[in-house]
C-alpha cells in the first residue's frame, strides 16, 4: 500500500504529504479524519487541526514557527502562512540528557593509505595549492601538464585548487585563508602537495611554510614563481619528483574507527528530515560507536534546534562552547542588519520547508543522537573522536570546504533539489527522494528516498555502510568522476 502522508511525531499538528495529494482527498491520520482543502505537493505540510492566528505549528515534536493567520484543518501550511519564532541572542541553560545507544561493535575495515605521521587517507592524490590567487593560471597548467604526462595513472587524481585570496586581506580573513590552506596541505588524502606562491603576497610563502608546523618535507614542496625563471618547467620538475614518490603508495587495511566524515545538507526539501538526514544520523551514531568521527557544521542552520545539541554536550564546558558557537553566528548576522531567521532559500520553500526552525530540526538529524564530544572554531583541525560541532556558515562551498579542512576524509551531502558541487575530498550526494535520484544519476550517489517507499531505515543504513566502506576504499563518487573539485574560504572583512 502506497504511503501518502507522514506524521513524524505524535505531538505534531501538521503532517507531510509523501506524494502529491489532491484537494478533496479524505485521509485518516492517527484517528483524525481530514479532508484536504487544497492540493498538497509532495514534501509539503497540511494542517491536522484548526489554527488560531499566532498559534505554534509543531513538526518533529517542536515548534517550527506560528500561524500568521487563522487556518483550517486540511489547509496547506507553507511559508505564506507560517512565520518564524526566531529572534536575536538568547540565554541558555544546560539541561544535560543521558544518551544510551545500543549499537554493536563490528570489526569493519576499509582500504586506506597510512601516512608517515600515522594518519590515514582514503585517497592518494597530488594537489597543487596556491598561496595567492595571482598564480591560479599557473597551477592549472601544471596540473594539466602532469595529468598529460602520466595519463592520470599511478595516483587517484592530480588537482589544482584555485582561490581568490592570499593577498589584499587583513585580520580574520587573512588568518582564515592561511588556516584552510594549511589544513589542505596537511590533509592525508594528499599523497603529495606542491605549494605555489607569487612572492609579494600577504600570505608570504616562507611565513606560510612555518605556519604549517610539522610536515613531511619529502611530500610537500614549495615554489615561489618570482624567484624562478620558467615557472612551468620548474614546477613540472618538482611535480615529477612528487609523482615518483606518491605513485608508490599502496592501500592497506584500516579499522573503521579511523574514518572521519563531514555531515552536510544543501538544496533541502520536505523529505530531508524524513529520509536522508535521519539516515546520516543513524550512520553517524554507528560510526561513533565503532570509534569513528563525524562533524556537523552549518551553524545558522542549527538556529531553532540548538538546545537539542546543547543538552547532548558531554560536559558544561562543551555546552558553553556551543552557546558561543551559536551566539557568535547570531551576532554576525545582527552586525550586518540581517534577521537570524532569514534562511530558507527559494528551493527550500518550493520543496516544503517554511522556516529556519523547520530546516534546523531536519538539518540536525544528520548527527544522530550521540553525545557532542568537541566544538571547533573555523579552520581548526580535528582533535577529538566522536561527534564534533564546527563553526562555518551554511553556504555549500564554504561549509563543505571547512569540513574537509577539519580533516574529514569525505563529506556526506544530503540534498532534495540536487547539486553537482564537490570539494577537495569525495563529496557524496545522498538524495532525499527517488525522483531526484532518477533524474540526476550523474549527481546522486545514493538514494535515501526508498525509506518512504517501504524499505526499512535499518536496511537502507546497512547498504549505506557498505557503500561508505567502498568509497573509503577507493570507489569514486560522481563529483570525482566528473572532476568537480573546488574550494571556498569564508570571508567577513574588507578587501584592500
Residue ranges and their predicted role:
Residues 1-410, 417-496:
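Metallocofactor- and cofactor-centric catalytic cores in central/energy metabolism, strongly enriched
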Amino acid at each position: 500500500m502506497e504511503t501518502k502522508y507522514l506524521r513524524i511525531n505524535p505531538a505534531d499538528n501538521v503532517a507531510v504529504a509523501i506524494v502529491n495529494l489532491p484537494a478533496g482527498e479524505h485521509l485518516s491520520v492517527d484517528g483524525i479524519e481530514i479532508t484536504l482543502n487544497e492540493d498538497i505537493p509532495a514534501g509539503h505540510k497540511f494542517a491536522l487541526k484548526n489554527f488560531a492566528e499566532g498559534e505554534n505549528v509543531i513538526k518533529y515534536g517542536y515548534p517550527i514557527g506560528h500561524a500568521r493567520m487563522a487556518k483550517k484543518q486540511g489547509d496547506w501550511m507553507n511559508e505564506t502562512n507560517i512565520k518564524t519564532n526566531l529572534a536575536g541572542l538568547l540565554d541558555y541553560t544546560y539541561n544535560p540528557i543521558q544518551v544510551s545507544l545500543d549499537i554493536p561493535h563490528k570489526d569493519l575495515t576499509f582500504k586506506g593509505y597510512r601516512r608517515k605521521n600515522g594518519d590515514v587517507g582514503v585517497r592518494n592524490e597530488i594537489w597543487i595549492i596556491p598561496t595567492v590567487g595571482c598564480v591560479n593560471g599557473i597551477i592549472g597548467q601544471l596540473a594539466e601538464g602532469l595529468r598529460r604526462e602520466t595519463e592520470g595513472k599511478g595516483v587517484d587524481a592530480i588537482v589544482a585548487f584555485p582561490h581568490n585570496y592570499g593577498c589584499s586581506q587583513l585580520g580574520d580573513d587573512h588568518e582564515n585563508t592561511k588556516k584552510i590552506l594549511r589544513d589542505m596541505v596537511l590533509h592525508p588524502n594528499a599523497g603529495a602537495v606542491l605549494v605555489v606562491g607569487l612572492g609579494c603576497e600577504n600570505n608570504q610563502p616562507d611565513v606560510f611554510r612555518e605556519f604549517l608546523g610539522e610536515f613531511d618535507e619529502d611530500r610537500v614542496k614549495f615554489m615561489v614563481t618570482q624567484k624562478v625563471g620558467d615557472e612551468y618547467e620548474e614546477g613540472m620538475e618538482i611535480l615529477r619528483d612528487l609523482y615518483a614518490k606518491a605513485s608508490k603508495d599502496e592501500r592497506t587495511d584500516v579499522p573503521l574507527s579511523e574514518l572521519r566524515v563531514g555531515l552536510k545538507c544543501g538544496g533541502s526539501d520536505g523529505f530531508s528530515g524524513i529520509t536522508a538526514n535521519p539516515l546520516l544520523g543513524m550512520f553517524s551514531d554507528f560510526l561513533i560507536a565503532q570509534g569513528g568521527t563525524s562533524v556537523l557544521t552549518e551553524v545558522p542552520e542549527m538556529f531553532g534546534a540548538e538546545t537539542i545539541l546543547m543538552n547532548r554536550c558531554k560536559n558544561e564546558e562543551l555546552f558553553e562552547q556551543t552557546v558561543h558557537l551559536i551566539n557568535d553566528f547570531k551576532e554576525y548576522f545582527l552586525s550586518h542588519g540581517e534577521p537570524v531567521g532569514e534562511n530558507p532559500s527559494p528551493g527550500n520553500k518550493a520543496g516544503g520547508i517554511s522556516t529556519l526552525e523547520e530546516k534546523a530540526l531536519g538539518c540536525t538529524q544528520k548527527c544522530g543522537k550521540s553525545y557532542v564530544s568537541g566544538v571547533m572554531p573555523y579552520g581548526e583541525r580535528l582533535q577529538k573522536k566522536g561527534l564534533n560541532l564546527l563553526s562555518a556558515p551554511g553556504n555549500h562551498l564554504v561549509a563543505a570546504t571547512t569540513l574537509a579542512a577539519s580533516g574529514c576524509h569525505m563529506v556526506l551531502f544530503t540534498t532534495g533539489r540536487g547539486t553537482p558541487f564537490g570539494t577537495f575530498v569525495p563529496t557524496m550526494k545522498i538524495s532525499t527522494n527517488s525522483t531526484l535520484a532518477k533524474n540526476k544519476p550523474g549527481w546522486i550517489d545514493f538514494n535515501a528516498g526508498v525509506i518512504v517507499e517501504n524499505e526499512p531505515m535499518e536496511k537502507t543504513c546497512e547498504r549505506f555502510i557498505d557503500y561508505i566502506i567502498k568509497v573509503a576504499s577507493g570507489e569514486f563518487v560522481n563529483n570525482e568522476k566528473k572532476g568537480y573539485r573546488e574550494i571556498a574560504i569564508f570571508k567577513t572583512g574588507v578587501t584592500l
